[in-house]
């Protein structure tokens, strides 16, 4: 693609790790102070975070231009984006289905079968796509339907095929559970709040009527649905503000903008420093932007 385009993609690949890392710490922090119950939705949520992190780690590796050149159009890239798309999207969707469908249908899905579905999908998914990292590193190209013998691809592709069947069986059983929960009257009633959730929608009947609340609910606490079931909590972490001084904000300053521009100049200078001109004759020197950016920061 050329030096400029390759450097731009490398820089953007590196920058995307910042908001993604914030999201992951947000999810982990949400669970950190709680008492985790390993029901089926939570298992899929944990699986989602794990698979998404693996996909993120293998993605941020490609901000290194030599690594990106090695993995380009290989099965390593296939493994990376499937960990993000299937591990991130499919596991998240199944988590949401197992969590919210009881509120929609009024029936609880079989918990043991749900955990079995998670086990099949988790094992099948990793058996399918994790070997593709190694296949890509030893040279198997993507978008190629066949290959010659003797490259060392056979065993790992057989493992991936077995994993794909296991993953497919898990998905089919899960979809069967979702569909049958609308029609199978033998399933256990869900009740209002089968998960001990704390938000107001779980104070409604399951399934929810054509309207939500017949009267506007009176909210006296942050977790009103929880307190409706268990009473007010005497010991909790919420503290009243000590005074009404408001939020302290820093004074107006140009230094954040100067720092941002300096960081940009430093990053671009380090990317292009000592690079060779496309003609092969000139070595570019970006010492000045690097020094200027360092001083600005």
Which ranges hold each PLM region?
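Interfacial and helix-entry/exit segments of alpha-helical transmembrane bundles
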Residues: 29-59, 75-78, 83-92, 96-130, ...
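Membrane-interface interhelical loops and short amphipathic "cap" helices
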Residues: 1-10, 34, 60-81, 134-157, ...
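Membrane-interfacial catalytic/cofactor-binding modules of polytopic membrane enzymes
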Residues: 40-45, 49-80, 85, 210-241
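Hydrophobic core segments of alpha-helical transmembrane domains in multi-pass membrane proteins
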Residues: 289-297
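Juxtamembrane interface elements at the cytosolic ends of transmembrane helices
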Residues: 1, 16-32, 93-100, 174-190
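Hydrophobic alpha-helical transmembrane segments
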Residues: 80-90, 155-171
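Extramembrane terminal tails and long inter-domain/linker segments of multi-pass membrane proteins
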Residues: 141-153, 179-260, 264, 276-283, ...
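Gly/Pro-rich turn-and-neighbor structural signature
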Residues: 1, 6, 19, 25-58, ...
